[in-house]
Amino acid sequence: MTEPLSVQQMAQRLKSADNILILCHKNPDGDTVGCGSALYYALKALDKNAAVLCSDTVPARYAFTNAHLFKGEFEPETVVAVDVAGLQLFGEGNGVPRYSRHVDLCIDHHAGNSGYADFTLLDGSAAAAAELMYRVILEMGVDITPHIADCLYTGVATDTGCFRFSATTANTHLVAAKLIEAGCHVEELNTLLFDTKPRARMEAERIARNHLEYYLDGRCALIYLTRDEIEQTGVDPADLEELTSLPISIEGVKVGLTLRQQPGGSYRISVRTAKGVDACAIARRLGGGGHNRAAGCELLGNLENAKNAILAEVEAELDAPQEDA
């Protein structure tokens, strides 16, 4: 069972540690990469030995974060997870399981965090883990340099859909304002993160749009990409994350589903919902999780089986009495 920590307590433990390994989640997004990189540079500012490790390759769009990736050059004494809600999200690549089996510290904003770490700083009201990381770094006594600000802004902006998602709060905007004051390159980052799409990404979107299907009297929209189609386009898997917003953007749709076949044949399913429909409840019943309006899971089997399984849970959720989510 994990022991909860305050921001101050987490900062103190990090200041007292050394030889620190920072773990990101598999299929890394801007929040986990941004948090991991920001913490890395904060620890280096305190003359700590640190590195970042992820089971998957960091997407090219986040290469500017430029944190040192762990190559086994030291024996970690403290393992810190950032933006990782459960053990199953660490992945199997790059030797991660050797270190993820015992995590000392966790900084996260997923309300469904499984409590796998010895000590956890958790705030489910934060729109991004980067909001928490900003407070931790300040409490560590480290200046927010322009580069640290860039890393943190990446986390905040990407996890909120450039401040459009419902989890965005006044505090989210306040943190972003502080990062801009610290020298964050906001225009360049917004262009890179939201306004620049590789040709391969556009081709994948074209294929996915051609697969658009409606279910449950138009209340659910679904798109999918098979492994062959993903490989055919040559798209970076990280660039497919943006596709998840397509189905839910359609007028009248309450649940948007995006299915992407993984290298092993399973289907990774992203669930996005309109207000009042709990995406996390849908995903959780299939072994996944996430947030109220954005969640996901992974299912074994062929495309039709994956569709049938997720659609059954969507129907159950849509037909259940709803509360504001």
Set out the residue ranges of the language-model regions.
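Glycine-rich, phosphate-binding/catalytic loops in enzymes
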Residues: 39-40, 96-99, 122-123, 174
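A generic local secondary-structure boundary/capping motif
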Residues: 11, 68-70, 93-96, 120-123, ...
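Short alpha-helices
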Residues: 110-175
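Active-site cofactor/cluster-binding pocket
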Residues: 63-119
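Short, motif-level signal for alpha-helix interfacial/capping segments enriched in acidic residues
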Residues: 2, 6-9, 85, 136-139
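Structural signal for conserved beta-strand scaffold positions within catalytic alpha/beta enzyme cores
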Residues: 54, 81, 106, 121-123, ...
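Hydrophobic helix-and-loop "lid/oligomerization" segment in the mid-to-C-terminal part
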Residues: 2-61, 72-78, 158-285, 290-325
